[in-house]
Amino acid sequence: GLGDVYKRQPKEWLDALTPLGTDENKKFIENAPYLIAIFEKKFSVSKNKKIKNYYVKESVGIATGILITCLHFSGLAMLTHTPSPMTFLNKILKRPSNEKPFVLLIVGRPDKDVKVPKFAKQKKKFEEITSIF
């Protein structure tokens, strides 16, 4: 279970999560009306021949960003979840081995009692994340 995942993680990683108030309890997954599993497809198979797909991470990342934007503009809330390891998704969703889980999106409307941690709302200034040449 997820508790086992947390037991295997380095203390530094667990300490980094502390301000977010996150732990092995993921009730939001059970309560969300939609779970969207996004996979990257490393290669395709055609006539028993393996065909490499290029720029997979870039393409899947861009497509995921567009989907997240659409979800937000549709009035839905979402968060990303990347349990480690994610290969269990291949098994439960019956996906082939040439597909690798990329991210799990938990989608729905926020619980009426939801509290977003103050730490999660702290954003860097534009100047801190941008270099203009």
Where do the model's predicted regions map?
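Short, small-residue-biased leader/transition segments that mark boundaries at the very start
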Residues: 2-6
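Extracellular/periplasmic catalytic domains that process cell-envelope and extracellular macromolecules
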Residues: 27-31
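Short, electropositive alpha-helical surface patch
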Residues: 89-104
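Short beta-strand segments
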Residues: 37-39, 106
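Short acidic (Asp/Glu) patches
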Residues: 11-23, 49
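C-terminal helix-cap and adjacent tail motif
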Residues: 103-133
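Small-aliphatic-rich amphipathic alpha-helix that forms the alpha element of a beta-alpha
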Residues: 36, 44-45, 49-92
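Short, surface-exposed beta-edge/turn micro-motifs
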Residues: 32-35, 101-102
